[in-house]
Amino acid sequence: MFTIIDYLKFYKDTSFNDVRWNDLDNLLGAILVYLPVPSFKEGKNLKSLYDYALSKTLATSSFMAPKAMEILNMVKDSKRYAEITISDFTNIKNEEVQFGACIIKTETEKIISFKGTDGSLIGWLENFRLAYEYPTYTQKLAI
């Protein structure tokens, strides 16, 4: 069975002209939004994002954070992803709210990637609020 890791390794030097942006590239964005870094607005290419992540890593209980760092390290020098930028990276987690999102820009696409809740108490509360509150505070943040 092939994994996202296999895809990223196989296509790392393949341009988007040869193989268009697709669902597996979207999955890369869905993983990178779990990077344990402070929020930032300006666009960063993957090399800059990696350096930023190394210097600004936040403490986290997310099991996805180490995998996101590993995958970012793997793709930061690839030809395929050399021109994409990550911007409007939002990472909010406190006693009342948990929210994460970023914008991924390619030459032709703009993709918004959202982080899901984790197994922490605030993650459970966020999920519970979906049953009785609309829109939730985090849904408002997403707009």
Predicted regions: what is each one?
Residues 1-143:
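Non-catalytic, mobile gating and regulatory segments of ester bond hydrolases
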